[in-house]
Amino acid sequence: MQHKLLINGELVSGEGEKQPVYNPATGDVLLEIAEASAEQVDAAVRAADAAFAEWGQTTPKVRAECLLKLADVIEENGQVFAELESRNCGKPLHSAFNDEIPAIVDVFRFFAGAARCLNGLAAGEYLEGHTSMIRRDPLGVVASIAPWNYPLMMAAWKLAPALAAGNCVVLKPSEITPLTALKLAELAKDIFPAGVINILFGRGKTVGDPLTGHPKVRMVSLTGSIATGEHIISHTASSIKRTHMELGGKAPVIVFDDADIEAVVEGVRTFGYYNAGQDCTAACRIYAQKGIYDTLVEKLGAAVATLKSGAPDDESTELGPLSSLAHLERVGKAVEEAKATGHIKVITGGEKRKGNGYYYAPTLLAGALQDDAIVQKEVFGPVVSVTPFDNEEQVVNWANDSQYGLASSVWTKDVGRAHRVSARLQYGCTWVNTHFMLVSEMPHGGQKLSGYGKDMSLYGLEDYTVVRHVMVKH
């Protein structure tokens, strides 16, 4: 397994402390990797800053060609990437290969095209004898911090728009799941000029802090927890860096009496538990109107009970393990606290799976109240709660009564209601009669403590640029 860092076009061993990388399906150590030292972090940032002088002036065509080459290489090595992701994250191998790899390739290809469509406003005379134009230019060095739930996917979401816009990047994957990013480093080093992409390994305190606080870094992009986002925003405040934050969610799933119950059950069974629920848009907070509440709980409970947890390399496995032992304990604690309320009923699941690995049973909890922690706090595991509601006004207020604002869905056959409720929901994305669907052309990003800034789409590309005014006297 490739375990070296990419700094200034060269693969080098880390000079810091060694950290174990685990297989969450077994709990075994896969390998130990040395972190980047403080000197290596500085070298990576300075390499990116030096490379920006040329890369920032390349044509969109040149940048697009590099991104397309990288997409092709990822596609050609799709099985290798899927196997690494499966071993390091515990994802079912078939899901990593069939779902994630094609989407990752598409992200790079989309931004290759988008790079050639980015432009400022046409020139105009707004002062006599002067012509003004608006430019969208790259910022410089971008420090990107990727999470452990979708390591390669999130690396793609961060690298592709930043590079397409003409920035240079220093990427730090999670120390829990670094293997696909380090493999990407090996393949990318011969495609991009030295210093344009740099990939490090290490913990937040030892590598993340010196990276995000470096004076040469002009933007920090994070996908992670609210706590990590708060830390980075505070840590970078003195240097006035631009920040791009995607900080989790607790998606409300609003099911009205007239909804297609079978479609809801099928949707939540898939979208509430995909990736073992380790997804910030997971369909995890159901509000069911009282007329269909009992039926939905019964049918959904039966469906969730059929989800199969198992070995990642088993084609029939639907849920793999959680990412780490620490996270398994967090999820278990959240469910135990829900049980302790006395009014929340475990319909199915509610316990760790016996045996090796960090497995938690797919869990459905009914009877949750609006103020319960299981409704208000992100669990980030295979745990879905159901809360009954009376009417539209009540459920919209409840859905918006959350610190999160990333994703939501509305299930109804009433087109007017779908439009009306969607317009009032305080979430970056609202799906109607589906959930979880993402495409490269549409933006993904949140409100409130879920953060700000957009991934994917032309809006995502613009986030990695600075608007500049140039005026010429004539």
Curated annotation (Swiss-Prot):
Keywords, alphabetical: NAD, Oxidoreductase
Any one Gene Ontology molecular-function term assigned to this protein's record: NAD binding
Record bears the keyword rRNA-binding: no
Alphabetical list of InterPro entries matching this protein: Ald_DH/histidinol_DH, Ald_DH_C, Ald_DH_CS_GLU, Ald_DH_N, Aldehyde_DH_dom, Aminobutyraldehyde_DH, PatD
GO CC annotation: cytosol; protein-containing complex
Practical and industrial applications: Can be used in the industrial production of the value-added compound 5-aminovalerate.
Residues binding NAD(+): A146, P147, W148, K172, P173, S174, E175, D209, S225, I226, A227, T228, C280
Enzyme class: oxidoreductase
Cell division recorded as keyword: no
Induction: Up-regulated under nitrogen starvation conditions.
GO biological process: L-lysine catabolic process; protein homotetramerization; putrescine catabolic process
EC number: 1.2.1.19, 1.2.1.-
Catalysed reaction, written as an equation: 4-aminobutanal + NAD(+) + H2O = 4-aminobutanoate + NADH + 2 H(+); 5-aminopentanal + NAD(+) + H2O = 5-aminopentanoate + NADH + 2 H(+)
Top-rank taxon, per record: Bacteria
Family, per entry: Belongs to the aldehyde dehydrogenase family. Gamma-aminobutyraldehyde dehydrogenase subfamily.
Subunit structure, as described in the record: Homotetramer.
Primary role: Catalyzes the oxidation 4-aminobutanal (gamma-aminobutyraldehyde) to 4-aminobutanoate (gamma-aminobutyrate or GABA). This is the second step in one of two pathways for putrescine degradation, where putrescine is converted into 4-aminobutanoate via 4-aminobutanal, which allows E.coli to grow on putrescine as the sole nitrogen source. Also functions as a 5-aminopentanal dehydrogenase in a a L-lysine degradation pathway to succinate that proceeds via cadaverine, glutarate and L-2-hydroxyglutarate. Can also oxidize n-alkyl medium-chain aldehydes, but with a lower catalytic efficiency.
PANTHER family the UniProt entry points to: ALDEHYDE DEHYDROGENASE-RELATED
Protein name: Gamma-aminobutyraldehyde dehydrogenase
Species classification: Bacteria, Pseudomonadati, Pseudomonadota, Gammaproteobacteria, Enterobacterales
Encoding gene per record: patD
